[in-house]
Structure formats: structure tokens, C-alpha cells
Amino acid sequence: MSIMPVKNALAQGRTLLMGRMPAVKFSTRMQLRNRTAVLWNRKFSTRLFVQQRRSSGEIVDRAKAAAANSGRKQVSMKWVVLTSFTIVLGTILLVSRNDSTEEDATEGKKGRRTRKIKIFNNNWLFFCYSTLPLNAMSRLWGQVNSLTLPIWVRPWGYRLYSFLFGVNLDEMEDPDLTHYANLSEFFYRNIKPGTRPVAQGEDVIASPSDGKILQVGIINSETGEIEQVKGMTYSIKEFLGTHSHPLMSKSASSLDLTSDEEKHREFARVNRIQLAGSEDTEQPLLNFKNEGDQSVREFKPSVSKNIHLLSQLSLNYFSNGFSCSEPHDTELFFAVIYLAPGDYHHFHSPVDWVCKVRRHFPGDLFSVAPYFQRNFPNLFVLNERVALLGSWKYGFFSMTPVGATNVGSIKLNFDQEFVTNSKSDKHLEPHTCYQAVYENASKILGGMPLVKGEEMGGFELGSTVVLCFEAPTEFKFDVRVGDKVKMGQKLGIIGKNDLK
């Protein structure tokens, strides 16, 4: 046995080994193992990447949700705090008002206590409504209405308004809608002569305006209360600022309605307002502003008109000085007429009478719509109003246009300097009655003669007219509450009526 060199033996062993091992299978197994490892690594790394992406997205979403919830919680907390503060403040106000009942009450005649006027009775709706700047809003609305409209807009806009509020365009004196430069001119439009026939008869009272009858009746001669709606009244003394007794203790044809100390004191007592110079300074002062004679020369009546009114008023006149006797068998009646936005906005004289005094009571401009009249106590006493006082053949007669929201102006044809709801300082002093007379219009009659059907003035948009007049007990109304009337239509008659 020969010994093989080491080098040759190693070479031979390598050859034998390579011959016995399947080289292809070995390489394949190595490739499969490597591929499996790669795929495993890829699968693992992809899943991890997806998980990482998902986890990062969830973190972002959770952060956004947390921020949104935090914002909602902050907003909710703000509303909770605001609501709680409002409730607490309102409770304090209500409690303080209830606790001050004795302070609000004043001692009247016969030991009877009366309470001051309140604009709400534990009603949040009217309380919030009463805090709105309605006078400023009405002035702004008046400025908007006075803006000149493009000619092409006018027919479309006015027809739309007429459709919404039931305006009868066929009655217009000037049917060309392009001639009305703005809404104010369209609101204050004139109607054709003869469109509103006036009820004739010396004992007939005609409607002073278009509108809806809200209330008619008799004024309580003991308390002087006027029924605003069923179960809700206001005082004629607070409404007109007249003497203590509703019938004024003497016929209106001889009433001296000009300013005098006794009347001022009575008016201050009725309205629970202290006169200047009094020792008690807790109550607001009453200032009577006498504006003198405001007669307009252009409206000076003719001789025939004076004679006609003298003949109508002769029942209460005799001898020189035009003194008169006490009225007998008479009562005070009232009628309330609401003018809707679509109505004819001018008001006319309902009877032959003499307007002697104009009293302007600046006030608020709450809405006088029927809903507010049913639910808002003392609405007419709180609102701005112009009381026109005088006399007719049966005694006292008054006609009072009452302002309302978005009614920026009450116009009087025979008092052109008179302006209501003005931003100027002319009529802005609180607790002040601005009074004027019309003696120079007729020296004989002592006031402005007005015949039935004569135009006196008007509103811009719509409002309310209140009539308070003295008449024989035989007077009967010819209309019912809720009836719609036209200017000149018969409201009532002394004697028989046609109401069934």
C-alpha cells in the first residue's frame, strides 16, 4: 500500500464530495431559504410600516377630536355662564320690582292707592321688546324710506308692496308709480276725490281714517278709564293730560285749555310727576313747554267756514263772551281705529269742530298692532302721541294720532312746524308736554275750525287714531269691534242706528 501525498488526497476528496452532493439542489435550497427570509422580512417590515402609519393617523385623529371636544366644551360653558347670568339678573330685577310695590304706589283721592305705569308684567318677551331702541329704529326706517329709488325699480317694488299689504292702486290720484320717488311718497299717497264719501248729517260721526275698529265704548265717568282691550284699561287723564274729571266739569266750548298753574298741578298729580320747585326730588319733574300759537297763515279759515262752525256750535254759545252752561245727559265715548300698512294713511276731521290745543307727548314707539294692544298694558299712554283738543256742538272733542314702530312722523297740515320722533333737541326733554294753541286761526272761535271730511294730516306707514268725545246719551255706535272701515264711513249717530 502506497502512501498518497497529502496534496493529492485533498484534491481527490474534493472531487468525490462534489460528485456525491447534488449541486443544483443545494443551490436551490439556498435560494429558497434566502427568498423566504427576504419575503418574511418584507412582510414583517410592511406590516410594521402599516401599523406605524395607522398608529400615527389615529394619534392625529384623536388629537383633532380632543381639540374639537375642548372647543365645544368651551362654547357650551360660555352659553351656560351667559344664560345663568341672564337668569340671575332677571330674577334680581323682578324681585326688586316686586319689593318696590309700595314705593311705586301713590296715594290718591279717598285713600285709594294707584300704581305707576308698568310696561310688562313678568313677561320676558315684552321686557326684551321694551329695551329695544325703537325710536332710533323708526328714524332709521324713515331715512331708508326716503332714499330715492331707481325709476325701473319703482313699479315692481310698489306692486310687490301692494300685493303683500292689499293696497288698492285703482284709488290713487296719480296712478303712475314711477312718479313716487321713494317709499315715503308712496305710503303718503293721495287718493282720487270722491273715493271716500263722507257720511252726512250733523249728528253723525264719520271715521277719521281707513282702518280696523279695535275698540269702541263709553269712558267710565267715575274713573276716567278707557278700555284698551277686554280687561285692560288706561286713563284718559294720562292719555290726554286733561282735568281731573272726565267731563271737565263744564262744557268744552268754554274750556280754557291753555296752560295754567292749576291744570299743571292736576296733570302732575295724575301722572305722578313732581312739579318744579317741590321739596320732594325723588320723582321726575314735569315741564310744560308752551310753544305759543302755531297757526299757519296759509290755513286761515274763510269767513264762510267760521260762520258754518258758529252755527254748528251755537248750541253751547249765547250772548257775548261765548260762555256756556253745564252739559246735561251726556257721556264720554271713545273709538280706537288701527291703520294697517296698506291703508290710506291720511286722517280727516270726523265732525265739524274747533281744534284749540295741540299737546305733544314724546314717548316710545312700540308697535300698535292688535297683538301688542291685547298684551301690552298702557300701550297708548307709553307711546308718542299728539292730542288735539277742542269742542263740537255737544261739548268736548279730541282726536289723538298715536305713534308706532317705524312710523317716523305724524304730520299736521295746519301746524307745519310740528315734527314727531325728531333727533333734534326740540322735543326730546323727558317728562315734558309740548303744548301749542291755534287762537290766531280764528279769533271768533278761538281755534282752528275743521269741517267734517277735511284733511288734517297723516302718518307715514300706519298707526292708530283714538277719538274721545262728549255726546248725548242717545249716541250709538254703528260699528263693531273688528270691523274694517273706510275714511268717511259712519261710526255712530245720535239717536237710531243701523247696527243689527
Swiss-Prot record:
Residues 45-79 are mitochondrial matrix. Glycans are attached at N34. The keyword Transit peptide applies. Residues 475-492 are annotated as: Required for processing and stability. InterPro entries: PS_Dcarbxylase, PSD-B, PSD_type1_euk. Residues 1-48 form a transit peptide. One of its GO terms (biological process) is phosphatidylethanolamine biosynthetic process. The record marks G462, S463 as: Cleavage (non-hydrolytic). Residues 57-101 are annotated as: Enables targeting to the endoplasmic reticulum in addition to mitochondria. Heterodimer of a large membrane-associated beta subunit and a small pyruvoyl-containing alpha subunit. Belongs to the phosphatidylserine decarboxylase family. PSD-B subfamily. Eukaryotic type I sub-subfamily. This is Phosphatidylserine decarboxylase proenzyme 1, mitochondrial. The gene is PSD1.
